Amino acid sequence: MAVYVSGKELFEEIVKSKERGELTPRSIFLLQKMIKEISKIFTYSREEDKEDCMAFAMFDVLLYWNRFNPEKSTNAFAFFTQTIKNGTYKGWRRLYKEKSSKFISTSQDSGVYNI
């Protein structure tokens, strides 16, 4: 797999961001690059769906970026990879809901119950 974001550079930018209280422009660029690459692991019916999932991922990054604790770990890449995957998957689940049965029948009854 190609290296598209340096873990060391990402860590340094996140530390700078935490000191400032907001994400630096460079950290936003690096995180957007990660989102673009990670979004490729999902399959989408339309390009707009991919863009929506990427937006969900960015929303999660903006919501949770300050939860990264550099005192506990220097691996910001792993933290943000998981955050991005979770956000992308939230969007994907919303767009492509799993089809499930909405009826229950029991072997004792001949009835079918609607949920």
Task: Tell what function each PLM region has.
Residues 92-115:
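Charged, low-cysteine interdomain linkers and short loop/connector segments
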Residues 1-98:
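Alpha-helical promoter-recognition and RNA polymerase-docking modules of transcription initiation factors
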